[in-house]
Design a protein with these regions (language model features):
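Structural microenvironment flanking redox-active thiols in thiol-disulfide oxidoreductases
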Residues: 90-125, 137
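Short active-site neighborhood of thiol/selenol oxidoreductases, capturing the structured segment around
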Residues: 66-93, 110
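N-terminal "domain-start" segment that seeds a small globular fold
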Residues: 34-67
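Non-catalytic, surface beta->alpha helical segment in thiol-disulfide oxidoreductase systems
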Residues: 147, 153-180
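Long, leucine- and charge-enriched amphipathic alpha-helices
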Residues: 1-47
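Short, internal strand/loop/helix patches
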Residues: 124-151
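Structural motif
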Residues: 78-81, 110-114, 135, 157
């Protein structure tokens, strides 16, 4: 009988410790959820319906890229050579851009980083896009509110003539021209 009492007391103690630890974990998870909610408050890029900001720059080949000169739908891609997901997404972006209805002139790819590090990306993208290399606070990233890489957006002119985002996260497996 004393052995049974000891076992029941031990199981009861273990259950109590488990309950206290579980409640502690739940409390910490709530704190982390609140912290993550505050950090994730800002969007990572312009959202659908938002106007593309002004940009006036040139591609690596010297082609002028000015928001007011954009005439049709444009696919924007943003990549960083230091970003592993960017390396994974780059071949799919290149393949998707190859089938854009407007061809190379309807695709603008921005590589964020120094020119030497960006050279490999520029080489792959130049066939299918007008490529810009800029710093993290560059004109293209600012115009589209980019805060994360990789980012792929599509913009078109609205009825009032403004260039607005129509797809804030282009699915590269979808045929070109289809929006969300």
């Amino acid at each position: 009988m004393p052995l049974l009492i000891a076992v029941v007391a031990l199981v009861g103690t273990l259950c109590t410790v488990n309950l206290v630890l579980t409640l502690g974990v739940i409390r910490r998870l709530r704190e982390h959820t609140e912290l993550l909610g505050a950090v994730q408050g800002e969007p990572l890029r312009l959202e659908v319906g938002q106007e593309v900001g002004d940009f006036d720059t040139a591609s690596t080949l010297g082609e002028p890229l000015v928001r007011d000169l954009v005439t049709g739908p444009v696919l924007f891609g943003f990549f960083s050579p230091t970003c592993e997901p960017c390396r994974d997404k780059l071949p799919r972006f290149v393949e998707h851009a190859r089938h854009e209805p407007g061809g190379r002139s309807s695709v603008i790819a921005t590589v964020v980083g120094d020119a030497d590090a960006a050279a490999e990306f520029v080489s792959e993208l130049s066939e299918v896009a007008q490529v810009v290399v800029e710093d993290s606070d560059g004109v293209m990233g600012t115009a589209l509110g980019i805060r994360a890489f990789p980012s792929v957006l599509r913009a078109e002119h609205a009825a009032d003539g403004r260039l607005v985002v129509v797809d804030g996260d282009v699915a590269l497996g979808r045929p070109a021209g289809l929006t969300a």
